Amino acid sequence: MQKPTRPQPKAGVLDIAAYVPGKEHVEGVAKVYKLSSNETPLGPSPHAREAYRHAGEKLELYPDGQALALRQAIAETQGLNISNILCGNGSDELLGLLCQTYLAPGDETIITEHGFAVYKIQTLAAGATPVTVKEKNERIDVDAILAGVTARTKIVFIANPANPTGTYLPFEEVRRLHAGLPQHVLLVLDAAYAEYVRRNDYEAGLELVSSNENVVMTRTFSKIHGLPGLRIGWIYAPLHIIDAMNRIRGPFNMNSAAIAAGAAAIRDRAHVEKSVAYNEKWLAWLTEEFTRLGLRVTPSVTNFLLIHFPDDAAHSADKADEWLSRRGYILRRVGGYGFPNALRMTVGPEEANRGVVAALTEFLK
């Protein structure tokens, strides 16, 4: 066997398809509306901006390795025990820590057909095998998940609400899923868009985590709180899981600005409610307008819509994306999520929302 001439990554790493974020620029277009990453058009709380500026006065100091101020703010506003909260550099880091902590080669995770790409990436990075199960009508199928569980299953990932569909699983179904899982299987509830949901049959998962040893819930500050640039996530989990994750977590995984701005953001309930009200108004308007144009829209409870395009080549999702991009509107292609003829659109500023509708009206003529 020939000796390698340079360092080699471990087996499987080069088989991982790298995550591709939503594009931000269009060549030759000066003014661009980025509607591809589900960012809030209202931005963060003014209090979060001020806390961020104040944190800049102490950059010579290491951050609090326990992120105590942020964990206290989360605990107080959510009514939780601070000991059950761990913060991370985005919920992506926390999902990765879960996989590093609980997966080994030969283990399996279950992800759903249109599930968030990071679940698969982190599973493979840990040397385990992701098993994909079908969804039903663009919604998570509990029976399909339970049928996919084997002796090798260690983690089940559920995005609720789901991305890129914007659909949600009623909480009785989440409870049914949990009841059907072996006690050693970890159920991960990724509730990144929970704050946007206003449905009586939806719960983010706090009670289920509180009363069980094999359920965790992850949340983010990148959506309703408008702080994706600071990368802030948190997990609510049983103490034994928090303890295990802390053993491999980096000692200063949260920076000072993120801790300060996050604490201020989650305490500003008025800004959150303002953001929810804005989203509800324009989500409904966009859904109605796209439907009027003859486009099918998957019913969404989030801050984005999945728009389905006709089968004819002249009006495909790819053609629509090119048309919109030339006019400065960047939506997200979702072929990699199993929707080759759909685009995902963030609810954006009013002028962008109206502009996309006007552009698609012209495109579909």
UniProtKB/Swiss-Prot annotation:
Its EC number is 2.6.1.9. CDD domains: AAT_like. It holds the Pfam family Aminotran_1_2. Its cofactor is pyridoxal 5'-phosphate. InterPro entries: Aminotransferase_I/II_large, HisP_aminotrans, HistidinolP_aminotransfase, PyrdxlP-dep_Trfase, PyrdxlP-dep_Trfase_major, PyrdxlP-dep_Trfase_small. Homodimer. GO terms for biological process: L-histidine biosynthetic process. It catalyses: L-histidinol phosphate + 2-oxoglutarate = 3-(imidazol-4-yl)-2-oxopropyl phosphate + L-glutamate. It is an enzyme of class 2 (transferase). Belongs to the class-II pyridoxal-phosphate-dependent aminotransferase family. Histidinol-phosphate aminotransferase subfamily. GO terms for molecular function: histidinol-phosphate transaminase activity; pyridoxal phosphate binding. It comes from Brucella abortus (strain 2308). This is Histidinol-phosphate aminotransferase. Keywords: Amino-acid biosynthesis, Aminotransferase, Histidine biosynthesis, Pyridoxal phosphate, Transferase. Gene3D superfamilies: Aspartate Aminotransferase, domain 1, Type I PLP-dependent aspartate aminotransferase-like (Major domain). NCBIfam families: hisC. Pathway: Amino-acid biosynthesis; L-histidine biosynthesis; L-histidine from 5-phospho-alpha-D-ribose 1-diphosphate: step 7/9.
